[in-house]
C-alpha cells in the first residue's frame, strides 16, 4: 500500500523455465498442460508451492493474504473444490487469508458455479474478480455471483492523470464500497 508502505496481499504467479535462462510464458505453459491433460495437476502443484511460500511470509506479516488464479472449469469441479478446501485447512491457513481469483473474461454464467462459490465461502476462502471492467458484463457478474474482492484491470489505473479515468475509478470504488467489497 502506498499510504503506509506495507504489503497486505500477495498473488501467486506461474513462472516456468526448463534448462534455459529464458522462462516460458504462463499462457504457453497452461496451453501445453491442457493439451497433455496435466492442467489440474499443474494447478495443484502451483497452489501447494504458493501456500508453502506464503506460510514462510506469514512469519514476517501475520495479516498477509494470498490469492491464486484458478480457471473457472476447475472451480466447477467438485473434486477440485474439495481438494482446495482441504489443502487450505491442512496448511492451517486462517479463514479469509486465502482467495481464488477468477478473471472477468471467464465464462461463468452457469448455474453450478454459485454452488461452488458458496462451498468456498463457507470454508473461509475469498473469491476475487480479477481484471474488473475489461469486459462488457462486469456489473452483471457482480449482481449474480458472490465476490469478496474486486481487482481493477491495470489498464484503468495507468492513466490516473486523465480526469475521466480518475472519475471512473472513483465510481468503481464507490460501487465496491456499496456492495461491501474490499
Stretches found by the model and what they are:
Residues 1-32, 69, 101, 129:
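Active-site core of bacterial EAL-family cyclic-dinucleotide phosphodiesterase domains
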Residues 4, 28, 32, 49, ...:
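Cyclic nucleotide signaling catalytic output domains
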Residues 7-8, 38-113:
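Catalytic core of bacterial c-di-GMP phosphodiesterases, primarily the EAL and HD-GYP domains
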Residues 25, 79-81, 112-113, 138, ...:
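Residues at alpha-helix caps and immediate loop-helix transition turns in enzyme cores, especially N-
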Residues 27-31, 40, 118, 166:
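Conserved long alpha-helical elements within nucleotide-processing catalytic cores of c-di-GMP signaling
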Residues 33-37, 41, 75, 158-164:
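Short, contiguous acidic/charged loop-to-helix segments that flank catalytic cores in large enzymes
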Residues 42-45, 165-171:
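Conserved acetyl-CoA-binding loop-helix of GNAT-fold acetyltransferases
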Amino acid at each position: 500500500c502506498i499510504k503506509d508502505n506495507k504489503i497486505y496481499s500477495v498473488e501467486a504467479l506461474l513462472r516456468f523455465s526448463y534448462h534455459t535462462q529464458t522462462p516460458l510464458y504462463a499462457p504457453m505453459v497452461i496451453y501445453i498442460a491442457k493439451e497433455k491433460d496435466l492442467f489440474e495437476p499443474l494447478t495443484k502443484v502451483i497452489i501447494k508451492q504458493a501456500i508453502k511460500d506464503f506460510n514462510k511470509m506469514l512469519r514476517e506479516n501475520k495479516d498477509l493474504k494470498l490469492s491464486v488464479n484458478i480457471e473457472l472449469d476447475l472451480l466447477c469441479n467438485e473434486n477440485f473444490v474439495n481438494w482446495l478446501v482441504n489443502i487450505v485447512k491442512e496448511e492451517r491457513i486462517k479463514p479469509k487469508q486465502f482467495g481464488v481469483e477468477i478473471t472477468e473474461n471467464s465464462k461463468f454464467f452457469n448455474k453450478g458455479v454459485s454452488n461452488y462459490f458458496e462451498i468456498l465461502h463457507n470454508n473461509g476462502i475469498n473469491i476475487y474478480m480479477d481484471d474488473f471492467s475489461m469486459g462488457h458484463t462486469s456489473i452483471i457478474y457482480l449482481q449474480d455471483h458472490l465476490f469478496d474482492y474486486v481487482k481493477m484491470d491495470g489498464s484503468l489505473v495507468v492513466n490516473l492523470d486523465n480526469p475521466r479515468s480518475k472519475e471512473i475509478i472513483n465510481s468503481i470504488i464507490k460501487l465496491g464500497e456499496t456492495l461491501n467489497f474490499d
